């Protein structure tokens, strides 16, 4: 489909090079951020750049329906400008593809930014929405990542820059591309389009404001439901699950050993996660077998409550994934394990976060270039070699217990 659409796009370039596109007085831009919730947090600088460069910009966002909670909470765009695709079933996905595409085309967009690295579905959507300027990542001459040639402002993906900076790069290209003529958009001699200096990566994201009354109410609820946990001043949260990619998880036995050490040092431990993570959490609780080690999987009913839970703890120990990024919006300290992917590209943006990586020769092995297909097949030695003793020492230091 990408190849066919590329041929069609090229034919239009040849036979209708000066086709008119509606231009809005204030730019109307669509951002495609389908897949991971944590990426929304890392995209904050990109949204800030778009708003700074285009005052009054009419921003729209397309996401998977299940991932929209973060965008709603952060409020980067108005609720009415959030568009979704429901991938719960093939039928619902096809239904939303049809109706959402029609809605987006009716908006008469000036530009679209595809933040999905080398996803073909997002590339197709960027063309289908009808925007004149189409910005997305390109593999250039690298093989195996083909997704067509209809993205008329392609940006090279840089494996040496944090993804938040690469998102900013897309926004800076949009600033220039919106002023270009059709001939300039098709002028390949000007590429790569990212020949400009990048800002330094943010050291820390600003904390998300939380309503004081709401925070007090959640604190009181915790005190009623988990008195032994809340009665301890040294509260530590563990995210044991690997989420959609279990290969990113530090071993369960290591978490159990860490929890036992924390209990022995007088701390309280809460195991967090989604409701489907409960069986794994119960195994940890059973192994630790102490009243100060509690299960919190499924306890928070939404992302806002998860952030309030972070406000009620001192430290989060987590695998690579959403919780570490969400925690960067709160005062909690974070220790995050990376290995199959690297914190140099995807680490939390927080001066309170510490990334632990073993530095194994094959790490990272999950990349945009191999469609996140690892050699290890579940045997993530890069995480297994991170010792419990090493983590214990860091945790106790952060808790000021050493």
Residues of each region from the PLM?
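Catalytic machinery of carbohydrate-active enzymes
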Residues: 1-402
